[in-house]
Amino acid sequence: MYDNLKSLGITNPEEIDRYSLRQEANNDILKIYFQKDKGEFFAKSVKFKYPRQRKTVVADGIGQGYKEVQEISPNLRYIIDELDQICQRDRSEVDLKRKILDDLRHLESVVTNKISEIEADLEKLTRK
């Protein structure tokens, strides 16, 4: 799993926290950030440079002229797909944790209100 990332020398893809991608001249710059260890101020990161792929395409659709366009490298596209899988999984785990905590807080509030209601009923019975 994550063969493209492993081919870059990333031995523990599960430690990836996030990534950034920017274009610089004729290159795409991929920067991968790893989870911070306790006591670290900055996350560890690695940077990779990919030349943009050049293609010549028909400029106007009629066949009168051609123009050169640049696209992201196919290898980089595969790497980004793997990074998206990792980062999306982390996001969904965080969302699930948030949902569970919200449900727990709601349950706590319902139980607290029910206890107050029962105590009030008991108080009414003891006054008689």
Swiss-Prot record:
This is UPF0325 protein YaeH. The gene is yaeH. InterPro entries: UPF0325. Belongs to the UPF0325 family. HAMAP family: UPF0325. It comes from Escherichia fergusonii (strain ATCC 35469 / DSM 13698 / CCUG 18766 / IAM 14443 / JCM 21226 / LMG 7866 / NBRC 102419 / NCTC 12128 / CDC 0568-73). It comes from the Bacteria.
